[in-house]
Regions:
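Hydrophobic membrane-insertion alpha-helices, especially the h-region
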Residues: 14-33
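Short, solvent-exposed, Trp/other aromatic-anchored flexible loops in extracytoplasmic proteins
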Residues: 111-137, 144
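Short beta-strand elements
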Residues: 82, 147-161
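Ser/Thr/Pro/Gly-rich low-complexity linker/stalk segments immediately outside membranes or between
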Residues: 33-51
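N-terminal Lys/Arg-rich, disordered targeting/topogenic segments
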Residues: 1-12
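Contiguous beta-strand segments within globular domains
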Residues: 51-87
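Solvent-exposed serine/threonine-rich low-complexity stretches and specific carbohydrate-binding patches
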Residues: 102-115, 153-156
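Conserved aromatic beta-strand anchor motif in extracellular beta-sandwich/beta-rich domains
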Residues: 93-97, 140-142
């Protein structure tokens, strides 16, 4: 006759397996964090985001007051003062939608190379007439070795339904 199966031992081994998988996920997250946010790479730089304004694509100009709330029908863009940054750093500016998709941006380049690109609009998705509702994040990042290593400016915008 076979010995009865110890169910506590099975549960214990299952728990150990879950703990091992959890540790692997934690270690992978820490490695990713250290890769994209290397220790000692914080410079204290701050990009000057002048504001987020309604955008006129025909004139490539911004109008109206600085805002963080827009209707779906309004195009909007960020205005950045690149002269507030040292000329030897490499930066880029990007718009991210609620899904994390890049929906506009410039760079990476040095601030003097971006001097004529102070207005960074959000692009309407192909096949659509209006911007999708949700949160949009505008981020200015410092690059080193071809990798973004520091966020030096950010603004959050809400597009209403």
């Amino acid at each position: 006759m076979a010995a009865p199966v110890d169910q506590v031992r099975t549960l214990y081994r299952t728990l150990l397996l879950y703990a091992a998988i959890s540790l692997l996920i934690l270690i992978a997250g820490l490695v990713e964090f250290v890769y994209f946010e290397p220790p000692g790479h914080h410079t204290g730089l701050r990009a000057t985001i002048v504001g987020i304004y309604q955008y006129d694509p025909d004139q490539n100009a911004v109008t109206g007051p600085d805002s963080s709330l827009f209707p779906r029908t309004a195009l909007f863009a960020a205005k950045v003062d690149w002269s507030s940054l040292p000329s030897n750093v490499v930066v880029d500016a990007r718009w991210y939608d609620s899904f994390g998709n890049i929906v506009g941006g410039v760079g990476p380049a040095t601030p003097p190379e971006l001097a004529d690109k102070t207005i960074i609009p959000v692009r309407v998705p192909p096949g659509f007439r209006h911007i999708l509702p949700g949160h949009y994040l505008f981020v200015v990042e410092r690059y080193e070795g071809g990798v973004p290593v520091e966020v030096i400016g950010r603004r959050l915008v809400q597009v209403e339904r």
